Amino acid sequence: MGFSSLVCVLFFFLGVKVYCQYESYQWDEDYDQEPDDVYQTEFQFQQNINYEAPFHQHTLGCASECFCPPNFPSSMYCDNRKLKTIPNIPAHIQQVYLQFNEIEAVTADSFINATHLKEINLSHNKIKSQKIDHGVFATLPNLLQLHLQHNNLEDFPFPLPKSLERIFLGYNEISRLQTNAVNGLVNLTMLDLCFNKIDDSVLQEKVLAKMEKLMQLNLCNNRLESMPPGLPSSLMYLSLENNSISSIPENYFNKLPKLHALRISHNKLQDIPYNIFNLSNLIELNVGHNKLKQAFYIPRNLEHLYLENNEIENVNVTVMCPSVDPLHYHHLTHIRIDQNKLKAPISSYIFLCFPHIHTIYYGEQQSTNGQTIQLKTQVFRRFQDDGDSEDHDDHHEGPEEEGTEENIDAHYYGSQEWQETI
């Protein structure tokens, strides 16, 4: 292999490494794990990675401050270079990465030549709303993703191009949203507004209702006291953790039939309608860290239920599952119910209603005098066979490590012998 061939191979692998670093976006967090208390952004800066430009950074047409991989000529990487202004962006660039700099303004001429841009990452800078020239993003007809998280924004950026599909605005100081700010965002599928200063008044006019393709809405860590009104029926993932929501209106979710995941932990929920979560497509439900005193109806397709840190004293299984249909069993597999006020494990009748359950995490419970108690069974696991048991041991992690376990016969519940015991 000649010298030129070796150089080409080297450039290829370097380009793939850089490209993969920025293009591996996740739709959302892993449903198998409890959401972190600290909101996770799409891109995480790693201290042990060298983000400086390689020696061959001066690719034809690339800004001198940045790096344009030869194998990915449409991408320009300008991150972590202590830039105070946006460098010149060539017309052929489609992705520009400017995160972890000291940029304070986005001027009208920032993208004047870069009309082919599909993705802009300006996260982790010092940008204020008044320093964004009006319409600077709206002039980009091909823009699909816009990252502005971890800045100093006070207003929702407006106007934006109707081509936009994903916008990240978490970790700002946004407290205002114009009524017509999102009217033209007909293609938006993901809106991240976590860690801002949004209260009920900001969403009163049902400003989100016209986003007919919206699938993921993140409103965690804001100042909401009630459920946001007028959400689009296309929604599949709704994050409302760490607000001050105390109730959910009757029939609130009737217009959200596609909802797959609902996270409303760390709020002030107390009494909620019995069948409020009767959603046929719901897979994950997190209502932990509230003030709930009793269980509620569990929809048939729900798999993961988080009830930790509430005030539940007794779990009435017949409330969760009023009837048993042998042809259409419930799909529930995991329950987390630690840090409640249980005095005994859940009735074994639960395995007739929910035959697919294989983990119930009881952990510690709160006693009436404020001290913690431990039930005889802290972790209930059901192993279908020896292979499942070995596989679980290989992946044993988290708070369940300290619990005791019970192994049961998966086919016992539902048998004639079981029927005679109830």
From Swiss-Prot:
A GO cellular component annotation in the UniProt record: extracellular space
PROSITE patterns in the cross-refs: LRR
Q: Where is the LRRNT domain?
A: 53-91
Task: Quote the gene name from the UniProt entry.
Answer: OMD
**Subunit description:** Binds the alpha(V)beta(3)-integrin.
List the glycosylation sites: 113, 121, 187, 242, 278, 316
Swiss-Prot/TrEMBL LRR repeat ranges? 92-113, 116-129, 142-164, 165-184, 187-207, 213-233, 234-255, 258-280, 281-294, 301-322, 331-353
Its PTM note reads:
The N-terminus is blocked. Glycosylated; contains keratan sulfate.
Its localization reads: Secreted, Extracellular space, Extracellular matrix
SS bond partners: 321-353
- Please tell me in which tissues this protein is expressed: Bone specific (at protein level).
Record keywords: Repeat included?
yes
Is-annotated flag, keyword Repeat?
Answer: yes
State the InterPro entries in the record.
Leu-rich_rpt, Leu-rich_rpt_typical-subtyp, LRR_dom_sf, LRRNT, SLRP
For this UniProt record, give its keywords in alphabetical order, as a comma-separated list: Cell adhesion, Disulfide bond, Extracellular matrix, Glycoprotein, Leucine-rich repeat, Proteoglycan, Repeat, Secreted, Signal, Sulfation
* GO annotation terms (biological process): cell adhesion
Sulfotyrosine modification sites are 22, 25, 31, 39, 51, 77, 412-413
From which organism does this entry originate? Bos taurus (Bovine)
UniProt xrefs under Pfam families: LRR_8, LRRNT
Q: Per its UniProt record, what SUPFAM superfamilies does this chain match? A: L domain-like (SSF52058)
Query: What's this protein's name?
Result: Osteomodulin
Q: What does this protein do?
A: May be implicated in biomineralization processes. Has a function in binding of osteoblasts via the alpha(V)beta(3)-integrin.
Q: Which PANTHER family match?
A: AGAP008170-PA, OSTEOMODULIN
